[in-house]
A protein has these predicted regions:
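Small beta-barrel nucleic-acid-binding modules, primarily SNase/OB-fold domains
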Residues: 2-6, 13-168
């Protein structure tokens, strides 16, 4: 009974929170923005997607695309209020025109559907369409997924560390 009462109390808060607007005060990269939430900055990691890193081809294009659509504007969040290991809030960003920023990035070829963390097939459909039309990064001959790029960078930095840290 107490649990049901708690849920009845919590449900309107969750619904209200998702209808609240937040100002985007920063765009860190294609899939990470900063919003003003209750007067404090909150970093938001766009769920379902992974954009190229800034040092990758199309990384800065993804950041600019996201920035053009949302920087300095009011947005809504569609979120389960979960955070990733870096304490970033995971969410879909809903723009003032009703479009979903996360989906717009995939649709225009600036992000991959991050299947490891998402089972939403609508993102996969958008990615396949962008690939077919050779939009954005799909115009590149051999685009490297960001998770593969990060993995290769991690391996090369570990190899260079181990070769420079031999005991004499």
């Amino acid at each position: 009974m107490i649990y049901k009462t708690f849920l009845l109390f919590l449900f309107p808060i969750i619904i209200f929170s998702q209808n609240k607007s937040y100002k985007v005060i920063g765009v860190k990269d294609g899939d990470t923005v900063e919003i003003l939430m209750d007067g404090k900055p909150q970093v938001v990691r766009l769920s379902h997607i992974d954009c190229p890193e800034k040092k990758q081809p199309f990384g800065n294009n993804a950041k600019q695309f996201a920035s053009d659509l949302c920087f300095g504007k009011k947005v809504k969040l569609s979120t389960g209020w979960k955070k990733d290991r870096n304490k970033r809030l995971l969410a879909e960003i809903i723009l003032s025109n009703g479009k979903n920023l996360n989906k717009e990035l995939v649709k225009n070829g600036f992000a991959w559907h991050f299947k490891k963390y998402s089972k939403d097939n609508s993102y996969d459909d958008l990615e396949q369409q962008a690939r077919k039309l050779k939009l954005g990064l799909w115009n590149d001959k051999s685009p490297t997924a960001p998770w593969e790029w990060r993995k290769s960078r991690k391996k090369s930095s570990q190899q260079s560390f181990s070769s420079t840290s031999k005991i004499k």
